[in-house]
């Protein structure tokens, strides 16, 4: 059971919810340049499993690493942290 606690958990923004039971989440993070020490912002997209299609585009969500669910899905939706405002 201790392995479950070692799984990566990311918070990001949903940029696509067009697939069935799958969302695309962009996670922004900072990395320090090895020589100059400047913090550089970069982003990465992850596909995550959304069993009930609860997350919508623009939502802030929390995703957790899991076993491979398809060729590209290695994460699952944990919770919707903040829902997007639709105008």
Swiss-Prot record:
PANTHER family found in the cross-reference section: 40S RIBOSOMAL PROTEIN S11 FAMILY MEMBER (PTHR10744), SMALL RIBOSOMAL SUBUNIT PROTEIN US17M (PTHR10744:SF1)
Gene, per the UniProt record: rpsQ
Its job: One of the primary rRNA binding proteins, it binds specifically to the 5'-end of 16S ribosomal RNA.
GO molecular function, one term: rRNA binding
Keywords carried by this UniProt record: Ribonucleoprotein, Ribosomal protein, RNA-binding, rRNA-binding
Keyword Ribonucleoprotein: yes
Protein species of origin: Macrococcus caseolyticus (strain JCSC5402) (Macrococcoides caseolyticum)
UniProt GO BP: translation
Pfam families hit by this protein: Ribosomal_S17 (PF00366)
Name this protein carries in UniProt: Small ribosomal subunit protein uS17
Entry annotated with the keyword RNA-binding: yes
Cellular component, GO annotation: cytosolic small ribosomal subunit
Similarity section: Belongs to the universal ribosomal protein uS17 family.
Quaternary structure, from the entry: Part of the 30S ribosomal subunit.
Domain of life: Bacteria
């Amino acid at each position: 059971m201790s392995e479950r606690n070692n799984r990566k958990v990311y918070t990001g923004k949903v940029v696509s919810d067009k697939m069935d039971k799958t969302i695309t989440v962009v996670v922004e993070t900072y990395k320090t340049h090895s020589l100059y020490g400047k913090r550089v912002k970069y982003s990465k997209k992850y596909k995550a499993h959304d069993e009930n299609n609860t997350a919508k585009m623009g939502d802030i969500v929390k995703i957790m690493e899991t076993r491979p669910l398809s060729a590209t899905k290695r994460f699952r939706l944990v919770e919707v942290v903040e829902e997007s405002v639709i105008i």
